[in-house]
Structure formats: structure tokens, C-alpha cells
């Protein structure tokens, strides 16, 4: 019997494929018979024979190509390369039959036949029916099992289907996840290519919000069936978020500098009639955004100079990550500790080292308050970074700022925890004074910057947490007497009166507020020292610590609903008259206000 597949006529093969069946008779139909006559002459129940014939065709095409005859091979490749919306595009059934035949011949799809494989990988499949998707998924599994060199390409292709496309539906992403999960289970080595593929396909920060959200949501879904990549993926997402965060602060700072130039006359004097634009003003201006996204906002890529849109993008991304972490960190499984440790690692490796970061750090601020054990871990990391002399001094400065801001603002902190942290800091100050108080230096701020940063954090904590620093457990309205403060707090007296003079080098905003609170609560009177320092500033120039507190009030709209229940707002002290001290007015007006007040 002559073989049907022995024909090299691709049109005849197309007829066989188009009809999806093959004649059950051993007689070969005449090739000149019309398609309707041919269709009526074949059996609808002989799918097995059809598969045998197609496998033979695929083998023949590959054999012919090896011998230099590319006709059958190219015809096969074109079936998958054809665009699905063209007139002559093959149907899903046609391609499915060919895929089944290719699946039985994956051992022959080596690098010499990579063009055919690439056409299959580039073909449209996620939008086809379930039967086709299952067939395609089986092909992928068999391909990388037999030809591991295609594994990186297959992983990249699958991850690319997690990206946003205007015509994508939820079911399309479900198909991509199903195929990826199958491949990972079938070929364990595929895990080694997963994270690198995810990282490579991350949208750029100037892409649309919908593109960012779609990809991140899909990647977080991958983490649910591949828990081993949760840590690296969280770090990658936080890294992307922090890039946007920093860019916003750069924009705000640049706008602030431009406004400073506008309100200064040619002679260098300040124009009193002009509006003074501070970082706080810009902050409010750029954060007056809607909590809900419009369709036009979603589909339009944000301009890098549009701070308002960048903040909306940052807000939505943080909300998504907050929501994902909420379900993970509140679970009862041990995985919650793995997720939290991943957050801690990202904080230490990235966030803590990023000075301009404004909002990303609230992920750890919120997460660390979900469990007392989480709180202890976070504070342990901060104190180790801050108080360890082997750490770089820039990192220690950042650690000191974070301790001060966290202890002041974290609402869930227990009184005992606050007292322990403050006691650790004051004991460190005491030990530092014992060692360095009598050292002479021309640049005290540079040489003793960590000392000043820790003192500044203690001042800041005192203003917010004076109630918790009292021994008495009476109501919040009470005014403690000097003997009611926790042991160790008296070290601040020695520090303030020391030759290192922290009130001179700490932020004026913090110093003035500390002076008011400490005087009102009868803790100590420091206005005379401030006055001496003011005179020294006029002689020597103005040089103080930055008033950077990373957990300043949270201004993003949508994600703030998650942060606010855990946030300790500034509260006026009972009985304190804000205007009771007039002697600090000259000092305050002679200094440069460093952005938004930390109170």
C-alpha cells in the first residue's frame, strides 16, 4: 500500500489536518478529489489513525529537512507561526492535532530544529479552549524533559504571559499559571530559572499602573504554589516600589529648590510677600489624590515628572503588597515567619540604606506590630545596627533615626518595651560619655555623629512617650514629678550638660520641642543652654543633625487605611501652653526649618 505521508505535497497534508480525521480504508483517496468529497469519504471515528499519520508526517518533515528538503518542515512551522486573526490561520483543532504529533517527536526537536520550536513557543495558546491548553501544556513538559536546552526559553515564555496585555482576560492568566505549575512539578530543574525569569520581565517604573499591578499580582500568585521564591520575589517587588518612592522624593526636593529660588530677590533677600513653599506644602499639594483610579489614569503611563501620578502608583502598589502580606503574616503556619524574615532582610539590605525613602518602610512598620515576637525581632535588628561599633557609621545613623521614629510612632508597643529600648539607649550614651566626653575635636558633629543621632532619637521619643517613661501608672493627664521617671533617664541630664553639647548639634525642631516638654514636666530646664548655643551659632555658623524620621505621618490615600490603626499620632500634652516660652522665638527664627515638622 502506498503511504499517504510519503507525499511531499503540503496542500494534501493540510487537507488531512483541516478535516481532523483520516480515511479508515486502506485505499488512498485520489488527491484531486474535492474537499467535500474527501471529507465525506473519511471516517469520523478514526482519530487514532489520524494521529499516526500526523506523527508520520512530522517525522517525514524532520527527515526531509535533515536531507536538505525544507518544504514539509517549513509548512509545519508556518502552521504555528500564522497569526490567529488571518484568513488562512489554522484552527485550534488543527494545531492541537499537530501538537499531539510533535509531542511524540520531542526527542527529535534538538537545536537544529529550534526554529520550529520557537514558532510553537511564540504561538497563541492561552486564549484557546481548555483542550488545546492541556495539549500545549503536555507538549511543554515533554519538550523540556527531552530537550533541557529549551528550559530557559520555556520559562521566559510562561512568565511573559503574566504581563499585562490589553486583550488579556482572567482565564488567560489562569491558563499560564496552570502550565507553569505543571512544568515546575514535572521538571524540578525549572525552579532554578524561575526567579531570574520573573526578575527579567518586571515592568519598568514608568509603565502604566495597570501593567505594574497585573504583573505583581500574577507574580504573587506564583509564590502561592512556589513558596520557596516568596523571599526573593518580595525583595524584588520592594526594590521596584522603593525606586518609585525615591523618585517622588527627588521630585519634591527639586520642586522645593525651584520654589526657594522664586521667593528670593535678586539681592539675595527673602521676599516676605511671597509664599514660602516647604516640603510639607508640596507634600499636601501632591497627595490630594483620589482613592479610586479612573480608567484613563490606569491606561496612561505616568510621566516621570508627574509627582501626583507617581504617588498614586506608589499608593496602589503598597496597598497590594500590604494586602498580600496581611494574609500571609496573619496565618497560623510557620510560613509567616519566613515571610517576615524576608521583610526584615529586605529592610536591612535595601530600605535602611535608602535615605530618601518615604513610604516603603511602612511595610515593616506595620508588619512588626502584628505580633510581639515580630516587634522584638525588628527592634533587635535596629539596636544591633545602631549600637554596634563595627557597623558603618552611616548605617548606624540610619538605625538611630529608625529607632527613634519607630518607638515614638508604633502604636502597638507595650510600655515595658519602650522603657527597655530607652534604657538601652541611655546606657549607651553614658558609656560613650565615659569614653569620649573629654576628647577635643574641631568637628564634633562629624566625629560624634552617632552620639548626636542617638541623643536626638531619645529627645524625640521623650516628647511622644513621656507617659510610658514614668514609673507611675496613673492616667495620661497626670504631670510626673522628677522622682517618677524610669531609672537611667537621668543620664540625659549629664549628656545635655556635657562638653559634647547635643542640644547644639541636634535638629532645632527636636531641641525646641524637647525643651518645652521637659520643662513642662519638670524633667529638666534647658533654655539657658539653648540660648548659649544660639549665640554660638551666630559666631560659628549653622550645622546640625538632619531631622529625618522615617515614620513621619503617612499621607498616601488608599494604603493609609492599613497603616493608621497602628500609628501613634502626636498628642498635645495636658496643660502645656504652646506659647508659654517666648525665649525660643529668636532661636527658632534664626534657623532653617528642615521640611515637615516631625510633630
UniProtKB/Swiss-Prot annotation:
Gene Ontology terms: biological process: transcription initiation at RNA polymerase I promoter
- Any one Gene Ontology molecular-function term assigned to this protein's record: RNA polymerase I core binding
Domain of life here?
Eukaryota
Keyword RNA-binding listed? The answer is no
Q: Which GO terms describe its cellular component?
A: cytosol; nucleus; RNA polymerase I transcription regulator complex
Report which residue ranges the record marks as coiled coil.
none
Do you know which InterPro entries this protein is assigned to?
ARM-type_fold, RNA_pol_I_trans_ini_fac_RRN3
Q: Name one Pfam family in it.
A: RRN3
Q: What name does the UniProt record give this protein?
A: RNA polymerase I-specific transcription initiation factor rrn3
Where does this protein come from, organism-wise?
Schizosaccharomyces pombe (strain 972 / ATCC 24843) (Fission yeast)
Amino acid at each position: 500500500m502506498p503511504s499517504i505521508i510519503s507525499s511531499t505535497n503540503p496542500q494534501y497534508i493540510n487537507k488531512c489536518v483541516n478535516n481532523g480525521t483520516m480515511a479508515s480504508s486502506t485505499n488512498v483517496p485520489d488527491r484531486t478529489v474535492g474537499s467535500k468529497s474527501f471529507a465525506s469519504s473519511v471516517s469520523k471515528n478514526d482519530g487514532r489513525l489520524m494521529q499516526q499519520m500526523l506523527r508520520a508526517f512530522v517525522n517525514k518533515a524532520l527527515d526531509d529537512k535533515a536531507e536538505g528538503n525544507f518544504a514539509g518542515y517549513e509548512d509545519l512551522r508556518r502552521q504555528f507561526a500564522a497569526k490567529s486573526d488571518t484568513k488562512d490561520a489554522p484552527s485550534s483543532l488543527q494545531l492541537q492535532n499537530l501538537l499531539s504529533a510533535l509531542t511524540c517527536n520531542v526527542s527529535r526537536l534538538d537545536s537544529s530544529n529550534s526554529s520550529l520550536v520557537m514558532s510553537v513557543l511564540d504561538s497563541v495558546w492561552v486564549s484557546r479552549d481548555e483542550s488545546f491548553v492541556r495539549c500545549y501544556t503536555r507538549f511543554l513538559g515533554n519538550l523540556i524533559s527531552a530537550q533541557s536546552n529549551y528550559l530557559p526559553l520555556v520559562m521566559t515564555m510562561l512568565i511573559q504571559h503574566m504581563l499585562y496585555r490589553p486583550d488579556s482576560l482572567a482565564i488567560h492568566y489562569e491558563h499560564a499559571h496552570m502550565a507553569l505549575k505543571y512544568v515546575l512539578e514535572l521538571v524540578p530543574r525549572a525552579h532554578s530559572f524561575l526567579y531570574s525569569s520573573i526578575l527579567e520581565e518586571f515592568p519598568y517604573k514608568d509603565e502604566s499602573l495597570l501593567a505594574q499591578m497585573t504583573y505583581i499580582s500574577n507574580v504573587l500568585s506564583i509564590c502561592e504554589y512556589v513558596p520557596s521564591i516568596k523571599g526573593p520575589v518580595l525583595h524584588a517587588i520592594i526594590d521596584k516600589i522603593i525606586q518609585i518612592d525615591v523618585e517622588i522624593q527627588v521630585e519634591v526636593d527639586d520642586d522645593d529648590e525651584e520654589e526657594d529660588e522664586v521667593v528670593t530677590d535678586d539681592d539675595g533677600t527673602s521676599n516676605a510677600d511671597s509664599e514660602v513653599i516647604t516640603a510639607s506644602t508640596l507634600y499636601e499639594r501632591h497627595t490630594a489624590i483620589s482613592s479610586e483610579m479612573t480608567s484613563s489614569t490606569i491606561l496612561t503611563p505616568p510621566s516621570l515628572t508627574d509627582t501626583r501620578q507617581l504617588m498614586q502608583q506608589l499608593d496602589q502598589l503598597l496597598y497590594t503588597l500590604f494586602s498580600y502580606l496581611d494574609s500571609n503574616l496573619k496565618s497560623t503556619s510557620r510560613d509567616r515567619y519566613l515571610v517576615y524574615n524576608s521583610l526584615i532582610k529586605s529592610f536591612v539590605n535595601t530600605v535602611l540604606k535608602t535615605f530618601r525613602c518615604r513610604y516603603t518602610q511602612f511595610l515593616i512598620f506595620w508588619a512588626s506590630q502584628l505580633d510581639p515576637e515580630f516587634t522584638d525581632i525588628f527592634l533587635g535588628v535596629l539596636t544591633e545596627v545602631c549600637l554596634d561599633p563595627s557597623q558603618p557609621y552611616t548605617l548606624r545613623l540610619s538605625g538611630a533615626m529608625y529607632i527613634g521614629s519607630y518607638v515614638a510612632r508604633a502604636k502597638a508597643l507595650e510600655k515595658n518595651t519602650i522603657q527597655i529600648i530607652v534604657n538601652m539607649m541611655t546606657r549607651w550614651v553614658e558609656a560613650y560619655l565615659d569614653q569620649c566626653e573629654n576628647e577635643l575635636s574641631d568637628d564634633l558633629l562629624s566625629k560624634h555623629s552617632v552620639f548626636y543621632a542617638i541623643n536626638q532619637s531619645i529627645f524625640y521619643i521623650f516628647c511622644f512617650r513621656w507617659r510610658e517613661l514614668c514609673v507611675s501608672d496613673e492616667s495620661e493627664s497626670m504631670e510626673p514629678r522628677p522622682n517618677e521617671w524610669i531609672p537611667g533617664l537621668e543620664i540625659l541630664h549629664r549628656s545635655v550638660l556635657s562638653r559634647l553639647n547635643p542640644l547644639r548639634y541636634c535638629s532645632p525642631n527636636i531641641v525646641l520641642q524637647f525643651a518645652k516638654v521637659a520643662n513642662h514636666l519638670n524633667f529638666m530646664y534647658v533654655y539657658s543652654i539653648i540660648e548659649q548655643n544660639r549665640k554660638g551659632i551666630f559666631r560659628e555658623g549653622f550645622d546640625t543633625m538632619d531631622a529625618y524620621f522615617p515614620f513621619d505621618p503617612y499621607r498616601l490615600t488608599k494604603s493609609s487605611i492599613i497603616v493608621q490603626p497602628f500609628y501613634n499620632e502626636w498628642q498635645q500634652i495636658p496643660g502645656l501652653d504652646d506659647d508659654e516660652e517666648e525665649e525660643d522665638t529668636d532661636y527658632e527664627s534664626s534657623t532653617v526649618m528642615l521640611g515637615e515638622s516631625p510633630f
